[in-house]
C-alpha cells in the first residue's frame, strides 16, 4: 500500500468515507470524513481547543482556514458568520472535496474550498483560524505563516493552535 500523509495533494490511500458526529457552531452535526485526511475519525483535540477558545468571528469579511482538512474550522466560521466568505485552503484534494460536500450538506454557500493558488492575490483576511499542518516540518510551516499572515487586513486577528514545539 502506498504511503501518504494528510498533506499529500492526492492521497494514495483508500478513501474509506465515514460519517462522524461533531460540534459545529454549538450544535451536533454529522459530517463526512475519509482516509488520507487529517483526523478522519474524530474532531482532534487541537481543533477542539481552538474552536472552544476563540471569540465570535466578525459578521463579514474574508476569513481563512489554513490547512482546512475536512472542514470543521471553516464550517464553524461559515455558520457563525453567514455574510463572510470563508476560504478553506488545503493541498489535499480529497480534503477539499469533503469540505465542499460538508458545506453543501449544511447549506453553507459561503465556503470556498480551494488550493492556495486559487485564492485571489488581492484578498485580505479579516481573520485567520488554523490548526496548521505541523507535520510538514518547521521550515515549510514557517513558509506558510510568512505567506499568509501578511494577508491579514488592518482590523484583523489570527487564531492558531499548535500541539508541538516549533
Where are each of the predicted segments found?
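A short glycine-rich, Lys/Arg-flanked "PGG" loop and its adjoining helix->strand segment in the class I
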Residues: 142-154
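Conserved beta-strand signature within the Rossmann-like core of class I S-adenosyl-L-methionine
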Residues: 155-162
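Glycine/threonine-rich flexible loop motifs
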Residues: 138-140
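Conserved SAM/SAH cofactor-binding pocket of Class I
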Residues: 46-122, 127-130, 136
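Short "lid" loop at the C-terminus of a central beta-strand within the Rossmann-like core
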Residues: 134-135, 163-166
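N-terminal auxiliary segments of SAM/dcSAM-dependent transferases
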Residues: 1-25, 36-40
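Well-ordered beta-strand scaffold positions
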Residues: 27-29
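Conserved SAM-binding loop and adjacent beta-strand
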Residues: 34-52
Amino acid at each position: 500500500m502506498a504511503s501518504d500523509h494528510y498533506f499529500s495533494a492526492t492521497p494514495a490511500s483508500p478513501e474509506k468515507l465515514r460519517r462522524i458526529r461533531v460540534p459545529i457552531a454549538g450544535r451536533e452535526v454529522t459530517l463526512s470524513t475519509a482516509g488520507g485526511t487529517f483526523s478522519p475519525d474524530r474532531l482532534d483535540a487541537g481543533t477542539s481547543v481552538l474552536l472552544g477558545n476563540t471569540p465570535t468571528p466578525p459578521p463579514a469579511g474574508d476569513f481563512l482556514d489554513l490547512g482546512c482538512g475536512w472542514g470543521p474550522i471553516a464550517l464553524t466560521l461559515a455558520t457563525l458568520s453567514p455574510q463572510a466568505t470563508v476560504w478553506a485552503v488545503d493541498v489535499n484534494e480529497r480534503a477539499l472535496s469533503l469540505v465542499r460536500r460538508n458545506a453543501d450538506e449544511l447549506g453553507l454557500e459561503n465556503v470556498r474550498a480551494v488550493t492556495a493558488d486559487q485564492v485571489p492575490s488581492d484578498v485580505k483576511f479579516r481573520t485567520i483560524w488554523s490548526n496548521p499542518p505541523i507535520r510538514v516540518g518547521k521550515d515549510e510551516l514557517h513558509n506558510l505563516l510568512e505567506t499568509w499572515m501578511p494577508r491579514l487586513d488592518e482590523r484583523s486577528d489570527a487564531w492558531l493552535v499548535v500541539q508541538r514545539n516549533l
